[in-house]
């Protein structure tokens, strides 16, 4: 019987270490929760630029969209920074297949379309790394 108990020591120790490590990781990842903080202009601009580029790449629309307004911005520190943003975006007059123009005016005719999007973006700003984790848009 003692031999069986010795044989279980290492697996049980490994299980204990795994549980402790996972508890620490989960604690770190949820450190503080989302907060409405004044985000640096540079970080929010690069995050919104990443968002709209991702949205345009995934969209089946012929026209490009641009961010019209940041409605709400929250951030949470994890292993990087998670941004929970709500933005209003609008369809522009620039087509996707055209050479990118410095300025794309918004549609003003029957093609006018605005969306409210709520997105979760993971970022490691000091490494210029962004990933769109979740996005949901509805017509406004």
Curated annotation (Swiss-Prot):
The subcellular localization recorded is: Secreted
Please provide, alphabetically and separated by semicolons, the GO molecular function terms listed in this UniProt record.
Answer: cysteine-type endopeptidase inhibitor activity; cysteine-type peptidase activity
Q: Can you cite an annotated GO cellular component?
A: extracellular region
Under SMART domains, the record lists: CY (SM00043)
| Glycosylation sites per record | 45
Q: Which cysteines are joined by disulfide bonds?
A: 94-104, 117-137
Q: In which tissues is it expressed?
A: Highly expressed in testis where it localizes to spermatogonium, spermatocyes and round spermatids. Not detected in spermatozoa. Also detected in epididymis, cerebrum and pituitary.
Give the domain of life: Eukaryota
InterPro entries to which the protein is assigned, alphabetical: CSTL1 (IPR042921), Cystatin_dom (IPR000010), Cystatin_sf (IPR046350)
Annotated Cystatin domain residues:
32-126
GO-annotated biological processes? signaling receptor ligand precursor processing
What Pfam families does the record tag this protein with? Cystatin (PF00031)
Q: Which UniProt keywords apply?
A: Disulfide bond, Glycoprotein, Protease inhibitor, Secreted, Signal, Thiol protease inhibitor
Q: Which residues form the signal peptide?
A: 1-23
Similarity field: Belongs to the cystatin family.
| Name of the protein in question | Cystatin-like 1
**Name of the encoding gene:** Cstl1
């Amino acid at each position: 019987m003692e031999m069986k108990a010795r044989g279980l020591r290492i697996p049980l120790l490994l299980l204990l270490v795994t549980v402790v490590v996972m508890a620490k990781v989960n604690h770190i990842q949820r450190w503080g929760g989302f907060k409405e903080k004044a985000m640096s202009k540079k970080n929010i601009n690069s995050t919104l630029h990443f968002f709209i580029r991702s949205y345009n790449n995934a969209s089946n629309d012929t026209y490009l969209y641009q961010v019209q307004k940041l409605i709400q911005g929250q951030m949470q520190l994890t292993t990087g920074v998670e941004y929970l943003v709500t933005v209003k975006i609008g369809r522009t007059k620039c087509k996707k297949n055209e050479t990118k123009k410095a300025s794309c005016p918004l549609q003003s005719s029957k093609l006018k379309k605005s969306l409210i999007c709520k997105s979760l973006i993971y970022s490691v700003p000091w490494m210029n790394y962004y990933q769109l984790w979740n996005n949901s848009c509805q017509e406004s």
